[in-house]
UniProtKB/Swiss-Prot annotation:
PANTHER family: PROTEIN-METHIONINE-SULFOXIDE REDUCTASE HEME-BINDING SUBUNIT MSRQ. GO terms for molecular function: electron transfer activity; FMN binding; heme binding; metal ion binding; oxidoreductase activity, acting on diphenols and related substances as donors. Disulfide bonds: none annotated. Belongs to the MsrQ family. The lineage of its organism: Bacteria, Pseudomonadati, Pseudomonadota, Gammaproteobacteria, Pseudomonadales. This is Protein-methionine-sulfoxide reductase heme-binding subunit MsrQ. It comes from the Bacteria. It is found in: Cell inner membrane. Its main location: membrane. InterPro entries: Fe3_Rdtase_TM_dom, MsrQ-like. The chain crosses the membrane at residues 8-28, 37-57, 75-95, 110-130, 147-167, 169-189. It is a multi-pass membrane protein. Binds 1 FMN per subunit. Binds 1 heme b (iron(II)-protoporphyrin IX) group per subunit. It comes from Pseudomonas savastanoi pv. phaseolicola (strain 1448A / Race 6) (Pseudomonas syringae pv. phaseolicola (strain 1448A / Race 6)).
């Protein structure tokens, strides 16, 4: 395993937010509606983790350090873990585990459908984020994992629909997402010398395994 301490550091850092929020809920420090706070916090954390995951490839190309790619899959799985926690909090505190209420919620809040589609996309990526799936799917694996761009769009739309009264924070995340997408365009990449240059043999070895 390459960069074990770096992997461990990323793992511990990703644990901090959920552990802290759950602890805050345990000691009743999240205000009068802790369930709503947890749903919102885990939802936002999912979007942030998705953006962090998408930034690994540009960072590797910019710096030439393969460590960014090494933790990309780990970060992607953390993104999925966050969205599972987001949906779990929603089922517990908003629905009260009453699936009959879900139909009412879907009619009143159609942005939930958008969020559910994003979840299904993340589920597909999480299930196939292993070497067996890479070998099994071949060239189709990369095409499947381009779903991350669609998922980002769905996540931003989901957030926009919820916070449209105050779009300042949304605009920040949307701007970061747009910037990361621009860095994927070959014409843009070639205009930035470091991004267009060779990333080194070490990074090539971990490109598909990170």
């Amino acid at each position: 395993m390459r960069y074990p301490f770096w992997r461990l550091a990323v793992f511990l850092a990703a644990c901090v937010a959920p552990v802290w929020w759950l602890y805050q809920a345990w000691i009743f420090a999240l205000g009068p509606d802790p369930g709503k706070v947890l749903v919102e916090d885990f939802g936002l954390a999912t979007l942030v983790m998705l953006l962090i995951t998408m930034s690994m490839t540009p960072l590797q190309r910019l710096t030439g350090w393969p460590g960014w790619i090494v933790v990309r899959r780990q970060l992607g799985l953390w993104c999925f873990a966050y969205v599972v926690l987001h949906m779990t909090m929603y089922a517990l505190f908003i629905l009260g585990l009453d699936l009959g209420q879900l139909g009412v919620e879907l009619v009143k809040r159609p942005y939930i459908i958008v969020g559910a589609l994003a979840f299904l996309g993340l589920l597909a990526l999480a299930v196939t984020s292993n070497r067996y799936s890479q070998r099994r799917l071949g060239a189709r694996w990369k095409k499947l994992h381009r779903l991350i761009y669609v998922i980002l769009g769905l996540g931003l739309l989901h957030m926009f629909w919820i916070v449209r009264a105050d779009l300042k924070e949304w605009a920040l995340y949307a701007g970061i997402g747009a910037f990361l997408l621009l860095l994927r365009i070959p014409m843009i990449t070639r205009r930035i010398p470091r991004l267009g240059g060779s990333a080194g043999t070490g990074s090539k070895k971990v490109q598909n395994n990170g």
